[in-house]
């Protein structure tokens, strides 16, 4: 009996774990199909949906059924048409609601960016809103697919053709040309598409530069002194270190005024180019044009480990240099903007969630770019189209059923295609640095030795002394601050 109890308990645990690993999957109404192959029978690569799945999208299913229609679900359940208020109950039917065994992911593809050449803000916007293939046609077709009437001009029978593009303040308005004759109900009331609230965000990873003009390092000063060993034993286990801070000056120019409207999302470090290392940071949420130059202070050091024979000295030479670098640069700025559709909806079918039939005038704004809110986010609404509670704006399932999944995916991908503007200019920097500390040939100490003692540094109890002429004011004028020399025991 004990063995049987353990086996039964194991089965219960296994069943529980199996149930826990299979979470409910969303049912996208646009992928449902009604098959008339008999009770619980679906076409190839389809399966009957069960009661719980049908319950999650009941309103969508009922909207696709006849008034008194009864269709089957899995496991001897049926769903009734709108005449029965969409009741789900046990029963049998000759038709069956089915769902793909491998549902399409149906994600909106991400297309390569639409790149706009450099220019000021008006130039960049003009190029975008006047581009028929990459902008006018895609946004016009989206308005048409959603049910807006008359998205086109009098001189063409096609959506998105013969469109006027008008600048209104900081906005641009697209509307079908009404300068000709038209036939159809309220055909003189063209739907409009307003483009507004342009913003530009720098993409740090898009940095590129042209030919680099880099000067050869120029010697600006030489410091010569001595390392003296006054002891009776050779000295070789000590490091002589030069520490200093140097100020590098940099500047950038921006070719066009668009840079004033470009902002940085995160703290941005200017990429290092060439041998002149200038570490530049631009704070987050700043205008790209707000910081066009400055000075960067950097702490640097150079070390050498001299070998100084007993009662000898070696010459020490430190060379100080400066170098310049300049080059043209380019970044990309990601553009974002609002699209506002305005016009009356077609009575013969529209994708507004209530599907009104009285041709109401409707204005709706989509945000193209970063997420703002659910009402303006195409991707959010598309991804949540299986949730009845989130279908407060557009019925994307209806749009898919009317126009096809591939058509809607392509349309939305073109509307959401990233748009990037070029930011160009010139960069220049000048920096100072010390070369290697050079050690010369040892010279025995003698009575005729004369050592300039502008600055003397002793190694603690080492018998090693540095006599280096360091003029703080002179070095500061050359861009070298806080210059110190030290003698410390070698670490390795």
Swiss-Prot record:
Q: Where is this site: Important for oligomerization?
A: 155
Q: Where is the signal peptide?
A: 1-21
Which cysteine pairs are covalently linked by disulfides here?
42-98, 182-187
Gene Ontology cellular-component terms for this entry are: extracellular region; host cell plasma membrane; membrane
| CDD domains in alphabetical order | PFM_aerolysin (cd20218)
Where is the site Important for heptamerization?
Answer: 374, 390
The segments labelled Part of the transmembrane beta-barrel after proteolytic activation of the toxin and insertion into the host membrane in the record are 256-288
Q: How is it modified after translation?
A: Proteolytic cleavage and subsequent release of the propeptide trigger a major conformation change, leading to the formation of a heptameric pre-pore that then inserts into the host membrane.
Annotated Pfam families: Aerolysin, APT
**GO biological process terms, semicolon-separated:** killing of cells of another organism
**Propeptide residues, per UniProt?**
446-492
Q: Which is an annotated GO molecular function term of this record?
A: toxin activity
UniProt entry keywords in alphabetical sequence: Cytolysis, Disulfide bond, Hemolysis, Host cell membrane, Host membrane, Membrane, Secreted, Signal, Toxin, Transmembrane, Transmembrane beta strand, Virulence
Chain positions covered by the region annotation Interaction with glycans from host GPI-anchor: 346-355
InterPro entries reported in the protein's UniProt record? Aerolysin-like_C, Aerolysin/haemolysin_CS, Aerolysn, APT_dom, APT_N_sf, CTDL_fold
Residue segments, region Interaction with host N-linked glycan: 68-84
Q: Where in the cell is it found?
A: Secreted; Host cell membrane
Assembly and binders: Homodimer in solution; homoheptamer in the host membrane. After binding to GPI-anchored proteins in target membranes and proteolytic removal of the C-terminal propeptide, the protein assembles into a heptameric pre-pore complex. A further conformation change leads to insertion into the host membrane.
Q: Which family does it belong to?
A: Belongs to the aerolysin family.
Q: What is known of its domains?
A: The C-terminal propeptide is required for normal protein folding and secretion; it maintains the aerolysin precursor in its soluble form and prevents premature heptamerization and pore formation.
What function does this protein fulfil?
Secreted, cytolytic toxin that forms pores in host membranes after proteolytic removal of a C-terminal propeptide, leading to destruction of the membrane permeability barrier and cell death. The pores are formed by transmembrane beta-strands and are approximately 3 nm in diameter.
Put simply, this protein is called Aerolysin
List the source organism. Answer: Aeromonas enteropelogenes (Aeromonas trota)
């Amino acid at each position: 009996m004990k063995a049987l109890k353990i086996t039964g308990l194991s089965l219960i645990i296994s069943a529980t774990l199996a149930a826990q690993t299979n979470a409910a999957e969303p049912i996208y109404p646009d992928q449902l199909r009604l098959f008339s192959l008999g009770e619980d029978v679906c076409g190839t690569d389809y399966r009957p949906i069960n009661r719980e799945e049908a319950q999650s999208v009941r309103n969508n299913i009922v909207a696709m059924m006849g008034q008194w229609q009864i269709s089957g679900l899995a496991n001897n359940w049926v769903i009734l048409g709108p005449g029965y208020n969409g009741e789900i109950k046990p029963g049998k039917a000759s038709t069956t609601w089915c769902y793909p065994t491998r549902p399409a992911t149906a994600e909106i593809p991400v297309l390569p960016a639409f790149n706009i050449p450099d220019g000021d803000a008006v130039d960049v916007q003009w190029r975008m809103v006047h581009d028929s293939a990459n902008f006018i046609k895609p946004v016009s077709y989206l308005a048409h697919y959603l049910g807006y009437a008359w998205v086109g001009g009098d001189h063409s029978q096609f959506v998105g053709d013969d469109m006027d593009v008008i600048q209104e303040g900081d906005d641009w308005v697209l509307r079908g040309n009404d300068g000709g004759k038209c036939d159809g109900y309220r055909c003189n009331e063209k739907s409009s598409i307003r483009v507004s609230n342009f913003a530009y965000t720098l993409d740090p990873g898009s940095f590129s530069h042209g030919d680099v003009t880099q000067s050869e390092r120029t010697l600006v000063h030489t410091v010569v002194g001595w390392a003296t060993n006054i002891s009776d034993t050779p000295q070789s286990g000590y490091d002589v270190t030069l520490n200093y801070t140097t100020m590098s000056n940099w500047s950038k120019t921006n070719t066009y005024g668009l840079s004033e409207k470009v902002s940085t999302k995160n703290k941005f470090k200017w990429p290092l180019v060439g041998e002149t290392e200038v570490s530049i940071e631009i704070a987050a949420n700043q205008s790209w044009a707000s910081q066009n130059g400055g000075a960067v202070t950097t702490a640097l050091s150079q070390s050498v480990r001299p070998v100084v024979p007993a009662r000898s000295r070696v010459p020490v030479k430190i060379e100080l240099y400066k170098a310049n670098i300049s080059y043209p640069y380019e970044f990309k700025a990601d553009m974002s903007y609002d699209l506002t559709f305005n016009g009356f909806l077609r009575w013969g079918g529209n994708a507004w969630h209530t599907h009104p039939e009285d041709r109401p005038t409707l204005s709706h704004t989509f945000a193209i770019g970063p997420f703002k809110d659910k009402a303006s986010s195409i991707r959010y609404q598309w991804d949540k189209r299986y949730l009845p509670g989130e279908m407060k704006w557009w019925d994307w399932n209806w749009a898919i059923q009317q126009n096809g999944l591939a058509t809607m995916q392509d349309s939305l991908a073109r509307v959401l295609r990233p748009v990037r503007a070029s930011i160009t200019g010139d960069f220049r920097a000048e920096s100072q640095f010390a070369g290697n500390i050079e050690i010369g040939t040892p010279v025995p100490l003698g009575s005729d030795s004369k050592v300039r003692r502008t600055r003397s540094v002793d190694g603690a109890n080492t018998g090693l002394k540095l006599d280096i002429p360091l003029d703080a004011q002179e070095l500061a004028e050359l861009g070298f601050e806080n210059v110190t020399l030290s003698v410390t025991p070698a670490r390795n």
